[in-house]
């Protein structure tokens, strides 16, 4: 399943998101959700312990001036890669 987090993790039920993640799921951070990828924050630490791959939309990182603050554990993608993820995962959960 593809999970997409488009809101700030501070304004989301992040604990519920973590509970619903399963091995093999993937999480895409976009819009304000990219703030979860900032190195050193508590949300990133939780994601590091999850059995998933975490992606962030590079254009949203650039728009928020966060490119130099993102953890190396996060896979940066563009809109073409975003489309590939949606094709790969017919089931999606939006947060």
Curated annotation (Swiss-Prot):
InterPro entries: DsrEFH-like, Sulphur_relay_TusB, Sulphur_relay_TusB/DsrH. Signal peptide: none annotated. Keywords: Cytoplasm, tRNA processing. GO terms for biological process: tRNA wobble position uridine thiolation. It comes from the Bacteria. SUPFAM superfamilies: DsrEFH-like. One of its GO terms (cellular component) is sulfurtransferase complex. Part of a sulfur-relay system required for 2-thiolation of 5-methylaminomethyl-2-thiouridine (mnm(5)s(2)U) at tRNA wobble positions. Heterohexamer, formed by a dimer of trimers. The hexameric TusBCD complex contains 2 copies each of TusB, TusC and TusD. The TusBCD complex interacts with TusE. This is Protein TusB. The gene is tusB.
